[in-house]
UniProtKB/Swiss-Prot annotation:
Active site annotation, chain numbering: 86, 176, 178
Protein name per Swiss-Prot or TrEMBL: GMP synthase [glutamine-hydrolyzing]
PROSITE patterns documented for this protein: GATASE_TYPE_1 (PS51273), GMPS_ATP_PPASE (PS51553)
A Pfam family: GATase
Sites where the protein binds ATP: 230-236
Species lineage: Bacteria, Pseudomonadati, Pseudomonadota, Alphaproteobacteria, Hyphomicrobiales
Length: 520
C-alpha cells in the first residue's frame, strides 16, 4: 500500500454532506494537511494516509435507516482522536453502543449552545456556564450515550449537542463547526487538531512546493511535458511549478481564441517569456474560433464549439512540436473529490477544464497535476511562493469560454471589440476607486439589445452594456456589490463617451441564487 507523504495529517470521512469541503478548508487553515475520502473507501484511505486524527462529516442520510453509511471500524480500533460532526456524531454513537432516534423537533439554522461542563476541546475558548451561537441542521438526534461519554453542552432541542469521551479523545457535536455561522467553529476544529491530536500545524506552501517539485521530477524523469497555459492563476502556477522541476523539458502552449480581455494574451506572453524564461508558444487561432462561433446564440453550443476547437488546435500544435509524454494541468482538489451517494457507490464527478478535457486520452499522454491537492486560496499562496505578483494572483476569475459567454446571443469581431473596450474601462474605474480587491468578480456584458439614444444633435441606435460585480467567499453563492451611485455614473459616462457602439449602461443587481454570476 502506497502511503501519502504527509506524516501529520487528518482524514475526513465523507458521508455526503454538502459542506464537507468546508471541514477540509478549516483543517488546512489550521496549517494541517487533510484529505476527504468517501465512506465507502475510507478504510483504504486510512491505511494509505496514516492520519493522526479522523473527522466524520455530516450527511443527508438518517442513521436510523437500514443501510445508512457507517465509519470503518478501523477508525475506532486505531486509538486515534475522532471528531464526529452532526451525522458523524450520530453514527459514532450508534457504532459505539449508543442510541439515535428520528427527532420530533427538527433543528435548522441558528441555535445557542449552553456549556455545562469544561472539556479539553474548549481550552482557551469556552468555559462552563457560557453560551455560544452555533449552526444546526439535523432531524435525528442522540438519545443515549455510549459508555465513557458525557454531555458537555446542550441546546434547547439537542440535549446531546456536544458530547465527549475525554479518555479516548472522542468528541461529537450536533451542530456544524465548519460553517461561518458558527463563529467559534474554526477554533474548535483547530483545538481538536492541535490540542487533542497534538498536530503542530506546520504544513506550508514552501514545504508543498518542494514536495511537488520532487514528485514531478520523479514522475517525468527526462521526458517532455506540454502544458496548456490559459493565462489564469491555476494553469500559470502549475506551469511555473513544472518548469521549476524540469526546466526546458516543459513547453507551454497558449491558444489565443480571440475571446480574452483587452491585451491579456500579450501581457501573459510577455510575463512568462521575459520574467520566467518559459518556452511558450503563442498560437493566434482567433479567426478559427470566431469564424465558427459567429451567429451561434445558444450558450451551451458556444461552450462545446470552444472546447472542441481548443482540443483540435492544441493537438495540432503539440504534434508540430513532436509530441510529449506528459500533459500538465492545473487541476485543483475540488475537481477530484468524489461526490458521495449515501444510497449506493460513489459517483466520481471529475470536472474537466473546458479546453483540456479529452486531451490525455486522444494524445496518449500521462497527466501531471501538481495542484490536485490544493484549494483555490492555497494555489494563490503557492503562486506568491513562486514569485507571481499579487496583481496577477489576485485577478478576478475569468471563464474558459471567455468573452463569448459575456456577449449573449450571436457574437462577431465587432461585438467582441466593443465589449473588450467597455470591460477594460469598467475594470480601470474599479481599480482607480480602490475597489478591485473588495469585489469577487466584476465584468461588462454586451447585451443583444439596441436602444435609441441622443449624442450631440444626432439620434443613435446602439447596444446596451450591463455591468456586473459580486461579492462572494467561494463563488457558490454571491451578492451584487453595492456601489455608490457616483461610481456607477462615472463608469457609465466613460463607457458611453469612449466606446463607439454603446449608448446605454445598466447595472445588474441579481444575487446568486436565483441568478448565476455569469450571464451565460
Amino acid at each position: 500500500m502506497t502511503q501519502t507523504a504527509h506524516p501529520d495529517s487528518v482524514l475526513i470521512v465523507d458521508f455526503g454532506s454538502q459542506v464537507t469541503q468546508l471541514i477540509a478548508r478549516r483543517v488546512r487553515e489550521a496549517g494541517v494537511y487533510c484529505e476527504i475520502v468517501p465512506f465507502q473507501s475510507a478504510e483504504e484511505g486510512f491505511n494509505r494516509l496514516q492520519p493522526k486524527a479522523v473527522i466524520l462529516s455530516g450527511s443527508p442520510a438518517s442513521t436510523v435507516d437500514e443501510g445508512s453509511p457507517r465509519a470503518p471500524q478501523i477508525v475506532f480500533d486505531s486509538g486515534l482522536p475522532v471528531f464526529g460532526i452532526c451525522y458523524g456524531q450520530q453514527t459514532m454513537c450508534m457504532q459505539l453502543g449508543g442510541k439515535v432516534e428520528s427527532g420530533h423537533h427538527r433543528e435548522f439554522g441558528r441555535a445557542f449552545l449552553d456549556v455545562d461542563k469544561d472539556c479539553q476541546l474548549f481550552e482557551g475558548l469556552w468555559s462552563s456556564g457560557s453560551r455560544h451561537q452555533v449552526w444546526m441542521s439535523h432531524g435525528d438526534r442522540v438519545t443515549a450515550l455510549p459508555d465513557g461519554f458525557e454531555v458537555v453542552a446542550t441546546s434547547s432541542n439537542a440535549p446531546y449537542a456536544f458530547i465527549a469521551d475525554e479518555k479516548r479523545k472522542y468528541y461529537g457535536v450536533q451542530f456544524h463547526p465548519e460553517v461561518v455561522h458558527t463563529p467559534d467553529g474554526a477554533k474548535l476544529i483547530g483545538n481538536f487538531i492541535h490540542n487533542i491530536a497534538g498536530i503542530k500545524g506546520d504544513w506550508s506552501m514552501s514545504a508543498y512546493r518542494q514536495k511537488a517539485v520532487d514528485e514531478i521530477r520523479k514522475q517525468v524523469g527526462d521526458k517532455r511535458v506540454i502544458c496548456a497555459l490559459s493565462g489564469g492563476v491555476d494553469s500559470s502556477v502549475a506551469a511555473l511549478l513544472i518548469h521549476e522541476a524540469v526546466g526546458d523539458q516543459l513547453t507551454c502552449i497558449l491558444v489565443d481564441h480571440g475571446l480574452m480581455r483587452k491585451d491579456e494574451a500579450a501581457n501573459v506572453v510577455a510575463m512568462f517569456r521575459e520574467h520566467y524564461n518559459l518556452h511558450l508558444l503563442h498560437v493566434d487561432a482567433s479567426d478559427r474560433f470566431i469564424g465558427e462561433l459567429e451567429g451561434v446564440s445558444d450558450p451551451e453550443t458556444k461552450r462545446k464549439i470552444i472546447g472542441r476547437l481548443f482540443i483540435e488546435t492544441f493537438e495540432e500544435e503539440a504534434k508540430k512540436l513532436g509530441g510529449a509524454d506528459f500533459l500538465g494541468q492545473g487541476t485543483l482538489y475540488p475537481d477530484v473529490i468524489e461526490s458521495v451517494s449515501f444510497t449506493g457507490g460513489p459517483s466520481v464527478t471529475i470536472k474537466s477544464h473546458h479546453n483540456v478535457g479529452g486531451l490525455p486520452e486522444r494524445m496518449k499522454m500521462q497527466l501531471v497535476e501538481p495542484l490536485r491537492e490544493l484549494f483555490k486560496d492555497e494555489v494563490r499562496a503557492l503562486g506568491r511562493e513562486l514569485g507571481l505578483p499579487d496583481s496577477f494572483i489576485g485577478r478576478h476569475p475569468f471563464p474558459g469560454p471567455g468573452l463569448a459567454i459575456r456577449c449573449p446571443g450571436g457574437i462577431s469581431r465587432e461585438k467582441l471589440e466593443i465589449l473588450r473596450e467597455a470591460d477594460a474601462i469598467y475594470l480601470d474605474e474599479i481599480r482607480k476607486a480602490g475597489l478591485y480587491d473588495a469585489i469577487w468578480q466584476a465584468f461588462a456584458v454586451l447585451l443583444p439589445v439596441q436602444t435609441v439614444g441622443v449624442m450631440g444633435d444626432g439620434r443613435t441606435y446602439e447596444f446596451v452594456c450591463a455591468l456586473r460585480a459580486v461579492t462572494s467567499v467561494d463563488g457558490m453563492t454571491a451578492d451584487f456589490y453595492h456601489y455608490d451611485m457616483e461610481f456607477l455614473g462615472r463608469a457609465a459616462t466613460r463607457i458611453i463617451n469612449e466606446v463607439r457602439g454603446i449608448n446605454r449602461v445598466v447595472y445588474d443587481v441579481t444575487s446568486k441564487p436565483p441568478g448565476t454570476i455569469e450571464w451565460e
